[in-house]
Structure formats: C-alpha cells, structure tokens
Regions:
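N-terminal acidic, proline/glycine-rich, low-complexity intrinsically disordered segments
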Residues: 1-11
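Short, flexible helix-coil linker/hinge segments at the edges of structured domains or between repeats
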Residues: 203-220, 232-233
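Aromatic (tryptophan-biased) beta-strands that constitute blades/sheets of beta-rich domains
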Residues: 2-3, 15-40, 53-105, 113-114, ...
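Extended, amphipathic alpha-helical coiled-coil scaffold segments used for oligomerization/tethering
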Residues: 155-161, 166-168, 172, 197, ...
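Repeat-blade elements of multi-bladed beta-propeller folds
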Residues: 30-67, 93-111, 135-159, 176-198, ...
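Short loop/turn segments that connect beta-strands within beta-propeller blades
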Residues: 119-122, 163-167, 202-206, 246-250, ...
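Contiguous N-terminal and early-domain "leader" segments and peripheral loops that mark the onset or edge
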Residues: 189-208, 294, 298
Length: 415
C-alpha cells in the first residue's frame, strides 16, 4: 500500500492542538456570558412591561379617549389700524380661552371636552385636542401657550400645554389640586384656585412655582394675580384674612386679619380690596399689609351683582400710562382705573371687562360700540361700530389686523 504524499512509512502524523486557555480568561468569559444573559433578560422584561403598560392604558381608557390634530403655523398677520366700522365675518359657539384668546393668527376656543385652534381669518378649525372621557375645567392662552385643564374623577388636575400656533403638545402633567378649580392667566404663569388651595404653575413647562394650602378650617374666597403678587382672601370660621404671596416665588409676604370678607380687586398698580358692605376701597402696603381706606368705589347696592359674578381666580388687567405710571383697570358694572397710590383715576361706562393695549384701554361701551380710551384719563380716543350688534354684555375686545375679536359668551370676529 502506498503512503500518502509527504509522509514516509513509520513517521507519526502531526496533530495541531489549541493552546490552553488561561484560567483567569476562562473565568472572565464565563462571567461575561452570564452577565450578558442577565442583561438580555432584563431588557426583555422591560419591553414586556412597556407593552403591558400601553395595553393597560388603552384598556383603562387613558389613551384611547385622546384625539387631536396639529397644523402648520398660520402666516403672519399684518399690523393695521382698526377701521371706524367693522362687520361680522365669522362666529363660533366656542367659549373663549381666558387670558388672551388670540395669538399668532389663531383664536383659541373650547367646548365641553375639546380645545380648538381656529383660523383668525376664517373661523375654521386648524387644530384640535380632545378627551372624550373628561370634561374641561378651564382653557387659557398666554405667551403663545394654550393650557387645557381637564376634570378627571371630580378633580381638575389633568393639564396639557399646547403650542398655540400649531396645536402640538408641549407638556402634560397631573396636578395635586382637589375638586373643581377656576383658573386665570398672568404673565408667564397660570393661577388655579380651589376651595382650599391656590396653585401657581409655569405656563411654558407646567412646573410648580408654588402650591399654597389654606390653614385648617379656612377656605379660599378669591385670588387675584398681579405684578405685586397674588392677593388671596380667606374665611376661617368667623374670621377673615387677606394673604399676599409672591407671583412666581414661593414666598409668604404677609397675612392680615380684616374685619369683613374683603374682595381682592387690585394687585398691580397697588394692593387693594373692596369692602362689599360699604363699597369702600382699601389699600394695603406691600411690605406689611397696613390698611388705608382709599374712598368709596360705588354704593353697595350698585356693586352687589357685579361682585357676585367675579371669578374665584383672576389676573389684574394692567399696563402703563404715557407717563410711565402703573395702570390697572377693573370692571364692576363699569370700568374703574386705579392709580399706584390706591385711588381711582377715572371711571367709564362699559358692558364688559377691558383689554389694556399699550397706552390704550379697549372696551365695549354698548352692544354696538367699542371705544379706545386714553389710559391716563379714560377719555374716548376712537370708536368702532360693530355690525351686527353683540347679543349682550360681558364681551372683551382684542385687536386683529384691521378688525376686532369680541370674546364673551361666544367668539365673534369683526373686520
């Protein structure tokens, strides 16, 4: 028998063997393999938990009840002067957002469960955000952010922040507020007021600025936000107090006992509250809350209805005069303008709250006329005729191009 090439008879064949693995390396490989298996198992478990959480959310209705649509930002609106007479171009049955309901060519309105971003030119829906399982407590628009506060299980604590121009969601959170709340929009913050608490959050990101709980046996009557802080009236059994807190800082500035249930009416030009039993306006010092009567606003009988209609949460309507002095305007059946010393600068007839724009005050003086009043004197500087007339009082006027948005029981655009 012939031998294979390269091997002679009697020579042993050569066998290649793998080098021995160092014990330390073998141990490392074993431990690494075990760790990778554990890591993979953890990832698989997390993925499974995520799937189960999503399924649970849908099964409990937390996601399936949410719907919405976004839109591109509308084109910019040229700035113009309001015409002497304007006609109704569109109307929406939506309630207007609190704060400033028109921003960047979008009008924000809402019904029981849906927030709408309407095209300011046409009134058509550009974007919407809806929850079919919850009802809206409040909607606000300020600084290009729309805040929707929903009632879930009896608490107004589900909050969503939206980009006003597009309807895109910016942030969402659950508040700690219990029960129903009322809300108001001040510059950069949102104020929510419940029966036993006052809460201030940042409107850009929804983060807490502060949350104040009334002392035991006390309830919150009203809170007014302004540049000098948040002025809060409380009732504690038979005792009444006024409390001043910082607008954005978690700071108690003072708390004073007052003889009667005073109604906060000023928090920017000065700190003021009204005694409903006498109609007298009281001014309180910013440092200690020292009380100084400022004069009678009106006879108590003339203020009863307007005071009863004031919201529990409100923001001061303020600005500056041509001289750079602080200005604050309040509507209680008619307009009252306050000076920084706590006195009344002027008053004027009006059918609804005013809007302060630069050096002017815009207000509906009757159902068919909006006047531009000089902020320093209250004298009419211009008038705009509305056609057709408004159905009643309570409307606020906002400029848009050459026209006016009237926001009240509904939304009406006049151009």
């Amino acid at each position: 028998m012939s031998e294979p090439d390269g091997l002679s008879s009697g020579e042993p064949s050569q066998v290649t063997t793998a080098p021995a693995v160092h014990p330390a390396l073998a141990d490392y490989r074993t431990r690494t393999t075990r760790s990778m298996r554990i890591y993979a198992a953890v990832l698989a478990a997390l993925a499974l938990l995520t799937v189960l959480a999503v399924r649970a959310a849908y099964s409990h209705g937390e996601l399936v009840h949410v719907s919405g649509r976004t839109a591109a930002a509308p084109p910019p609106v040229p700035i113009g002067s309001t015409a002497d007479s304007v006609a109704l171009t569109w109307r929406s049955a939506d309630r207007p957002a609190a704060g400033t309901p028109i921003q960047d060519g979008v009008v924000v309105g809402y019904d029981s469960g849906t927030v709408h971003g309407l095209d300011a030119r046409t009134g058509k829906v550009r974007w919407y955000y809806a929850r079919s399982d919850e009802t809206l407590c409040s909607v606000l628009q300020q600084d290009a952010t729309t805040i929707a506060i929903y009632n879930r299980h009896g608490n107004c604590d589900q909050v969503t922040g939206l980009v006003t121009a597009t309807g895109a969601i910016k942030w969402q959170r659950t508040m700690t507020d219990n029960g129903s709340t009322e809300a108001a929009s001040a510059p950069n913050v949102v104020l929510t007021v419940a029966r036993y608490s006052v809460h201030v959050i940042d409107n850009a990101g929804g983060l807490d600025r502060w949350n104040w709980i009334a002392p035991d046996h006390c309830s919150v009557d009203r809170a007014l936000a302004g540049s000098q802080g948040v002025l809060i009236s409380t009732t504690c059994g038979g005792e009444h107090r006024l409390v001043l807190r910082g607008l954005t800082s978690d700071e108690l500035k003072w708390s004073v006992t007052v003889p009667r249930a005073m109604v906060p009416v000023a928090a920017s030009a000065f700190l003021g509250a009204l005694d409903p039993s006498t109609g007298i306006l009281h001014s309180y010092s910013a440092d200690k809350g020292a009380d100084t009567p400022s004069g009678q606003l009106a006879q108590p009988a003339l203020l009863t209805t307007a005071l009863a209609e004031l919201p529990r949460a409100a923001a001061a309507a303020g600005g500056l005069t041509a001289d750079g002095e602080p200005l604050e305007v309040l509507w209680l059946g008619r307009l009252y303008s306050f000076a920084k010393v706590g006195t009344i600068d002027w008053s004027a007839a009006a059918t609804g709250p005013a809007t302060v724009r630069a050096l002017d005050v815009l207000a509906a003086v009757d159902d068919s006329t909006v006047q531009r009043l000089a902020s320093a004197t209250g004298r009419p500087a211009a008038s705009v005729a509305l056609s057709p007339a408004l159905p009643g009082g309570g409307y606020r006027a906002f400029e848009f191009g050459n026209g006016l948005l009237m926001a009240g029981a509904d939304l009406r655009m006049y151009q």
